[in-house]
Amino acid sequence: MLPPPLLTLAVTNAAGGLNPDYHVGDIVVLNDHLNLAGLVGFHPLRGKNADDFGVRFPALSDAYDLGLRQKAHQAWAAMTSKASSRSLREGVYAFVAGPTYETRAECRMLHGLGADMVGMSTVPEIIVARHSGIKILALSLVTNNAVLQPVARGDDAALQSMTPEDMEAHLSKGKATHQEVLDAGREAAVDMQVSCHVRVVHSISADRNRLLWKRLFLGCDIPEARQQKAHLFLKLPERFALRAL
């Protein structure tokens, strides 16, 4: 097996909160995932295995490195005060293919399966990285709270007297929108892209690991992002990027 082109991969994403204890703006350190798409055949390692990168059947029981998760908690404790309104949590991420947001029944199912968050990214990259022996640190920003309550019933007598406008407002409560995801990302930009990222990266770099930091949050306020007017990506080395495709 060839040595990996990097030792550590840090990824971030925006996710819907399934855990009722989570709030919009909370940051969650991933410790496990549910790859729902992978269970039905949508898997990044399908096809002939590239033996130079890893084994045919890699184990994912320890996909999220414990040491890196500990460093993330230590860095957060060092940078936040008791008065901070943003919490750092640790939980399980459910990956779905999208692009639609989840139905209420799907949200209840995912939460019942043990997921704390749900999103449409990150897990394929993590699987490819772990296949190549790369350590993973993954962080989610909770950008909206998933709706777990059952949908309104057509025979609900309490709804019969509602005006169409009131009915629309009632049914729209908690509905996920892309705009609220963008807004939550912009609000968290300073914490996530400057303070937290810098401290965690410095903590990891102290171990002299080579680090790839993949930034997926929108609305970053640091100068480099404003100049590029785009997401920030530190490029994967060529052969790793080709394997990821």
Regions found by a protein language model. Name each.
Residues 155-167, 202-210, 222-245:
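Eukaryotic N-terminal low-complexity, Ser/Thr- and Lys/Arg-rich leader segments
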